[in-house]
């Protein structure tokens, strides 16, 4: 990219800045949850909603981000995303109650939902096609560093300052990013078709109320009647979307996507698989601190091997899939992740703390292989005219399933521990043991979906098929 103009390189730095902010925020909060609970006078069982409110908002807003960027302009939307994210960070730091914090996290989520997809769109518009891959590698690298720094930085700030600083550090960064966006980024627009507002609202209502209903009486204090009503509203909203999208060329997500078998299987497997995987980044630092008595900083450091394992495995995923095929890889990694989850619980409860970094490194390797395989399986056979829509739907499902996973993890803690989870409680480790056993079972379930993937589905087979279809 050395032959790119200086202005373009600065624009890529701005996008990379946004990727870093968004990825850092998704991991820095996890380590701080026990301290937040103590500061706000809440049970740790309720703190999963701090993550859910952000991730669910991202899932809801993702479908609108690309259309808004084309309609209003990439600079205007990227600037708005940074401003909303920064304001949300400020309001998070100023929150005095859990409800205030949840609303502020939702505002952060609106900004986070627009930051990454609009950043990708910006790169497509400012960089020549032949340099697009190199440019995307450059801007996504900080996004890979964010999860590496997030847990340890969050623990460090909590231990030596306060949890408020995990949000306050976003403010100067956000101000610089917003000013740089206005000064340096061009405002590309495109002629757009009419936005499917009806479909967007139906999906948003369905996802939001079903997740809220899943949290149930343990997290929200809702009555059984209210929960039943939410489930009914959510199901009706999703059914209405299916009726709305049928034979509708302007639907937010075309039902024609599901005519491709690998897309249907991959999407179902991604949804179920990420529910299980979404539990782990939330539960691991909470367990280390509340269940084992680790300090926030120590718990954050323990998460680094998992990220390193994930980053290291990405280099050889393609060779693994080409050698063994999608079905074998996905079934093996799904069952393997379940076994590693049990291994982590066992070594932790036995007090073999020196083994935990190796177990977490292995967990990161297995999880990364499964994530990459799920993503490529889902999208690889889609025709070109449906590829963009399929990618957007997959991104939305990824965020939604992660929020559901965190919700279920909180629900399991509440189910086994009622309101008595604390470092001083004699039953705490028993509560976590039952929770981790349940998580391992849930993580293993998607293997039944992946077992239905055609046996000849390899990366190289898919490429040859795509070439034949293009001829």
Curated annotation (Swiss-Prot):
Residues 1-11, 70-76, 125-137, 186-196, 246-262, 307-341, 417-430 are periplasmic. Residues 33-48, 98-101, 159-164, 218-224, 284-285, 363-395, 452-471 are cytoplasmic. Its main location: membrane. One of its GO terms (cellular component) is plasma membrane. It is a multi-pass membrane protein. Keywords: Cell inner membrane, Cell membrane, Membrane, Transmembrane, Transmembrane helix, Transport. The chain crosses the membrane at residues 12-32, 49-69, 77-97, 102-124, 138-158, 165-185, 197-217, 225-245, 263-283, 286-306, 342-362, 396-416, 431-451. GO terms for molecular function: transmembrane transporter activity. It is found in: Cell inner membrane. SUPFAM superfamilies: MFS general substrate transporter. Belongs to the major facilitator superfamily. TCR/Tet family. NCBIfam families: efflux_EmrB (TIGR00711), PRK10504.1 (NF007799). This is Putative multidrug resistance protein MdtD. The lineage of its organism: Bacteria, Pseudomonadati, Pseudomonadota, Gammaproteobacteria, Enterobacterales. The gene is mdtD.
